[in-house]
């Protein structure tokens, strides 16, 4: 009798503030979990919004951790090991130009709320270039059957909710207003590293494994 193979670990390459920084702490508290320490965090109390409603609304980004995806979660192709992934990330990070991000704005992106770079800001070009490089250079390491597709039109975003239809319209409005106020004090962020996250089993919480600094 054969033993079924365990599902492969999936990885995500993303932007994320450095753990311990104010930018990381702010996002982790909003979501209710620190993906670096793998510990829950107390969420914001929003007047008029039940705690369980906010917890439900933030469930999806809480599982993924505080990250802006550059390459969608992927499993390693057969024969590719962790060392090869680390080497590829080092090469990739050293090929990218760091940039300062402007103050991020709360916007609706599809059916979620997220922090985004203003559409007219030049940083979007650098972020789009980095995302394209991630997809191109890591494609050879990825198992096509273990990948999730990202939208063809990339837009940098840090998700702060899951699907808005999980709560009613008045709650959506209260959460939007609270997010605008909460993140208005977010310190300026720099895109100067690639963050590597891992999902150890299907449906498990993602963990932040590493930050690979850009060399320039």
Predicted feature residues:
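Basic, often amphipathic N-terminal segments
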Residues: 1-109, 125-185, 201-216
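Short histidine-centered catalytic/ligand-binding loop motif
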Residues: 75, 116-123
């Amino acid at each position: 009798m054969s033993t079924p193979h365990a599902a492969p670990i999936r990885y995500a390459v993303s932007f994320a503030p450095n753990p311990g920084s104010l930018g990381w702490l702010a996002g982790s508290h909003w979501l209710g979990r620190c993906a670096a320490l793998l510990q829950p965090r107390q969420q914001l109390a929003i007047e008029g919004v039940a705690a369980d409603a906010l917890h439900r609304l933030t469930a999806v980004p809480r599982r993924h951790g505080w990250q802006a995806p550059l390459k969608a979660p992927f499993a390693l192709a057969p024969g590719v090991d962790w060392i090869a992934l680390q080497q590829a990330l080092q090469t990739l990070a050293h090929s990218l130009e760091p940039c300062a991000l402007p103050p991020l704005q709360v916007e609706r992106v599809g059916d979620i709320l997220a922090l985004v770079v203003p559409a007219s800001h030049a940083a979007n070009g650098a972020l789009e270039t980095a995302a394209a490089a991630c997809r191109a250079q890591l494609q050879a390491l990825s198992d096509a059957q273990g990948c999730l597709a990202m939208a063809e039109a990339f837009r940098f975003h840090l998700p702060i909710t899951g699907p808005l239809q999980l709560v009613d319209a008045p709650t959506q409005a209260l959460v939007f207003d609270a997010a605008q106020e909460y993140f208005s004090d977010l310190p300026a962020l720099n895109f100067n590293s690639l963050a590597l996250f891992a999902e150890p089993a299907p449906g498990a919480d993602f963990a932040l494994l590493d930050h690979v600094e850009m060399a320039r």
